[in-house]
Amino acid sequence: MITSVLVANRGEIACRVFRTCREAGIRTVAVHSDADETALHVRLADAAVRLPGTASADTYLRGDLIVKAAVAAGADAVHPGYGFLSENADFARAVTDAGLTWIGPPPEAIEAMASKTRAKELLGIAPLDRVTEADLPVLVKAAAGGGGRGMRVVRRLADLDDALTAARAEAVSAFGDGEVFVEPYVENGRHVEVQILADTHGTVWALGTRDCSLQRRHQKVIEEAPAPGLNPRLDAELRETAVRAARSVSYVGAGTVEFLVDAHGRAHFLEMNTRLQVEHPVTEAVFGVDLVALQLRVAEGHALETDPPPARGHAVEARLYAEDPAHGWAPQTGRLHRLAVPDGIRLDTGCTDGDEIGVHYDPMLAKAVAHAPTRAEAVRRLAGALERAAVHGPVTNRDLLVRSLRHEEFASARMDTGFYDRHLADLTAPAPDPLAPLAAALADAHGRSRFGGWRNVPSQPQVKRYTMAGEEHEARYRHTRTGLTADGVRVVHADARLVVLEADGVRHRYEVARYGDQVHVGATRLTALPRFPDPTAQHAPGSLLAPMPGTVVRVAEGLTEGASVEAGQPLLWLEAMKMEHRITAPATGTLTALKAVPGQQVTVGSLLAVVQAT
């Protein structure tokens, strides 16, 4: 029997595993970097062990330190979560060599499926050894790849050699393995996967399908179960192939087999992920199971029932990220003041009200999941819940999620992996609520600050300025004997937390929350502007300011003050949340100041460089 589990991970998945362990009466152990010392997963655990340092390479990717932590804390089992070391066969061996229970598949199964070429061989899928014009387009892919790295689409035979060379170089850099292979390129196919669960007694469950076609930069955004619109033949084929993949490597535990389904309904095997997936909650909702609890039972040697439980209804999940669509999807940091969704929605998160969202790790704040008898009901429920959710803090992708769920192409289940290539610009176009600044101003009228326009005569117009969706807006109102008034609308009610406005005969209700100069009016985020700007905050035209806190990792070779630069030319690179972000010249001109140096830690708004346009 497992009595104490260390989760070799952080954030949302660590909290998720701890929840199931608590329900089972199992003691929990967390590990944490210095940056995560006060993180929610640390606060939830019964015990916690520090991994000195901040970078993932020094902490969550140090299998030796994590095994020592498990032994020191008295854990008898290790759950890897997902990401980090979850698909590292050497780590799995180190855990078992230390006499601990590994809550995952055998190391040999991890190794076999780590190589996409080896996985295809096990399933009898022949690679494209020789590419002809008839095979085009094709995809050059890293055998050990993932996340879009080490991949090149080839549409002309003349480009194949260069694509192979580039993919090999990228694969070596990203994965330390230069093996690549070529496969047919499925243009705008559907990403469909099968959840499997296997025990040590020969039983393998195929727990239905999931559709994860809505992806941006090869990262999943919205997932659902079951995959809609699959014909029974294809559904059976996908499940059978997934079970066959698991049996081919004597798999044990939870895993996912991924496919691309083309426009003709043909399935193309992608890979097998030998771990729990981020999107596992939609499968749990549909089948009424706890996959983590089943992982624990399988690891203890218990047998699964012969058949999985029946599926019921439909579930949809959306990933809420702290990222800014208006600034190249740059990860956002800062205080998360409040995160809450309406009742009936599952929220898996690794943070809570008051937590600081840092720069060091993945910017996902939470996963929101809705389950209902039908797909249409689940989609409607999730979209409405996200729209009404309180997400007070850094800028997020909330609007993208709501608009995606309500897009006609998604609603009719006609989406594919090219969805965001076609629609991202429209889905992220600013659509500010014109009444939001007035609601913010009226709520703020109950207290005066430097952000308001003070008047000796209350009946004179009051003016407050805000930025909203990247643009500046003014709100004007008056104090009268009967209360607050504004031109063009009727102020039905106004206090610091609730404003009700009537415009064109329609009443609009706004819940308002303010945190310093940050104001949340319903789902709209505004920033209050001071009436008298601080002169010390002014910067010269052409100033390049850090869009996020991070580390300057490099400056363009040979770049010095006085150099001529072209508009769009990369000048330096910032690293934040495991991603590099280019800082480019805003105009053609002269670099008159260069303040950044490699290794420098910067905060939001730090002056990096100045380009004087010519």
Task: Kindly label every feature range from the protein language model.
Residues 156, 198-203, 262-265, 372, ...:
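Short acidic-glycine loop/turn motifs at beta-strand connectors
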Residues 1-257, 261-277:
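N-terminal beta-alpha lobe that positions the nucleotide/phosphoryl donor
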Residues 507-547:
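Catalytic P-loop NTP-binding/switch module of NTPases
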Residues 149, 226, 362-368, 542:
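Short amphipathic alpha-helical segments
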Residues 478-483, 487-508:
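Conserved nucleotide-binding/hydrolysis modules and their immediate coupling elements
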Residues 185, 350, 371, 494, ...:
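Residue-level recognition of beta-strand microenvironments
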Residues 242, 281-284, 289-488, 567-570, ...:
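Catalytic cores of soluble metabolic enzymes centered on carboxylation/carboxyl-transfer
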